[in-house]
Amino acid sequence: MASRLTPLTLLLLLLAGDRAFSDPEATSHSTQDPLEAQAKSRESFPERDDSWSPPEPTVLPSTWPTTSVAITITNDTMGKVANESFSQHSQPAAQLPTDSPGQPPLNSSSQPSTASDLPTQATTEPFCPEPLAQCSDSDRDSSEAKLSEALTDFSVKLYHAFSATKMAKTNMAFSPFSIASLLTQVLLGAGDSTKSNLESILSYPKDFACVHQALKGFSSKGVTSVSQIFHSPDLAIRDTYVNASQSLYGSSPRVLGPDSAANLELINTWVAENTNHKIRKLLDSLPSDTCLVLLNAVYLSAKWKITFEPKKMMAPFFYKNSMIKVPMMSSVKYPVAQFDDHTLKAKVGQLQLSHNLSFVIVVPVFPKHQLKDVEKALNPTVFKAIMKKLELSKFLPTYLTMPHIKVKSSQDMLSVMEKLEFFDFTYDLNLCGLTEDPDLQVSAMKHETVLELTESGVEAAAASAISFGRSLPIFEVQRPFLFLLWDQQHRFPVFMGRVYDPRG
């Protein structure tokens, strides 16, 4: 029976609007975030030599990862105190005097100092560029390479942020592509410091004109991304954002109704339909004052290159200082590119899949060298070097044994974003390009992933006997390991995580 890997990912982001002091004439009153975003990695990512590829046998298609992402914006009824920030704004321009020629200046020494005493100056609105649905040909040519490098850097940063919020020696799975897609859609309507801080977190170049077009181009035969916007009737979304979102993300905004239960069913139904019903309930509840929901779903479909052995086997797996017996899947001819990495002190193996996708496993080599030691040594530079070396390595028929995997991972994303030193969702959110409402705040953000790797993906497959010499390469996975689902065409991780207990 051939094997199937089915990761599913959910991301829920709740945003609230603080209307306790909102000025109906104002468009934004955000202040500069005092925290500096962390530095970006600028390592270049080299091209791959795909001159060798093993023949692909006829194998029935299997189901692979599914990802869903949601942002929910609600009206904030907690009355957040922010009058101090608001009072620092200048008076409206209409209240400032315009001195006529020849009129003597006011005597500041004899009159109280007021706004009318100040010289007339043009008011400066917060920087809020309109969403760009077009980019130049010259920018488009280099945008995919920039995006793949940025996604790689972001994925490694995100891995460490997730790991820092998880308990030691626990399973973990997430989709960097899903989270980046969500944040990039937020970036489409971001202004001022929120825009620059998002660019920094995502490792994007400043004013990356073609990022949305490039992200749209990363949807291929094996990776499909779809988006949808839901909003309340009383939320005024800018036409420029609606048009750009339709052009770039293929979503026409849908209006929510007055019934929260009906809205909840509407949103969860959309998620289920766009994740092949792998994710049936993204939201457990929906606040009655919800004003905006942004959704993103990523669906992957791939198949193994070679069928696995139909017989079932149990084998030992090292878990928490003891050995446990877990179901294993095996193949005597699976195409694997592998090498030992001295920096990580780990064996790296790349399992070839269809649609230019691959499953990469990093497992410690020495018994005393644990997975946490591998994680500590992993940084964007090391990660890119590993992927480059894999690109130059040949896929050879290999005796492969690896466990059936079931991983469920749920994560509060606000804590992850704070580990990344991004605080705008909590303190200073500026979405002036999305709506004229200046008072939005994130109240919750959640990411959920389910990863399943089994042998039940294909009903029937042809078996063929092939004899190999004693020098057949071996790749065995019997210890906790790090994994990623790699898009070989666009060179970025779609899913990442670690497995301590294959049983889930």
UniProtKB/Swiss-Prot annotation:
Annotated CDD domains: serpinG1_C1-INH
Signal peptide: 1-22
Transmembrane parts of this sequence: none
Skewed-composition ranges (Polar residues): 85-124
Region called Disordered, residue ranges: 22-67, 85-141
Site (Reactive bond): 470-471
Bias (Basic and acidic residues) ranges: 39-51
UniProtKB keywords: Blood coagulation, Disulfide bond, Fibrinolysis, Glycoprotein, Hemostasis, Protease inhibitor, Secreted, Serine protease inhibitor, Signal
Major location (coarse): secreted
GO CC, any one term: collagen-containing extracellular matrix
Domain of life: Eukaryota
Cystine residue pairs: 128-432, 135-210
Recorded GO MF terms: serine-type endopeptidase inhibitor activity
Cellular compartment(s): Secreted
Gene Ontology biological process terms in this record: blood coagulation; complement activation, classical pathway; fibrinolysis; innate immune response; negative regulation of complement activation, lectin pathway
Glycosites: 75, 83, 107, 243, 356
Family affiliation: Belongs to the serpin family.
Record note on quaternary structure: Interacts with MASP1.
Entry function: Serine protease inhibitor, which acrs as a regulator of the classical complement pathway. Forms a proteolytically inactive stoichiometric complex with the C1r or C1s proteases. May also regulate blood coagulation, fibrinolysis and the generation of kinins. Very efficient inhibitor of FXIIa. Inhibits chymotrypsin and kallikrein.
Name of this protein: Plasma protease C1 inhibitor
Species in which this protein is naturally found: Mus musculus (Mouse)
